[in-house]
Amino acid sequence: MRQAGFWFVAAVLICAPAAAQQPFTDDTVTQLVMAVLHQYFDSPSMLEVSVSGAAQVGDLLIVQDLLVLGKPAVVHGLRGEFLLHLAGVEVELAALTSGTIKARRVQKATVVAKSTSAAIQEALSRWSGSLINPRIQLQNGSFTVTAILRRDDALYPTVAHGALAVVGGQQVHLVLTDVTVSGSNVPVDLIGNELARVNPLVDLSKYPIRLFVDRLVLHNDGIELLATNIKK
């Protein structure tokens, strides 16, 4: 149903006669934005969209101001919440037919997102079937994970300490600084395989608006992230 809604709105926009400046109703643009957003978020997500100053100029859809609130927002099983503000957005109408919208221009983009240790803990269980009963503790700037890793019929109690790292400006990775694995004949790739399943924890490059991590804070209550369209 989401894809059907997307193509309906796309058809309405593409078939509209090109004019010097043609207004769009808030409802039309909201449907378009919601259809695009639902391609990137899991079904439990609750999204609210507010649009103002939308118009067609030639082959462009221009939105002066766009706010999106996701509470909760779920991405690949990781639950959190976010607030997105976009100003001065220009989108090519022809790009709607591809189903993957890339904005031609965004004057300003700001995203504030956060998640909790409980949500991360739940997501770890979903991401890896070999990770049994993971428990995560967050401290200022670091974390500790305790879990049992399963490989075939063997079980390996594990304690790992680490931090979060920004990679390439757009990804957030779990980086381990110290790992203790109990058991005999521990496979050399045991930890590496688990990290490969988890990382990247966040990947902003997958979204239609270019965003870069501006600030990443890890504290006792959870994780907070600030992203903008300005690359440092």
Q: Each PLM stretch: what is its role?
A:
Residues 23-52:
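N-terminal amphipathic/hydrophobic interface segments
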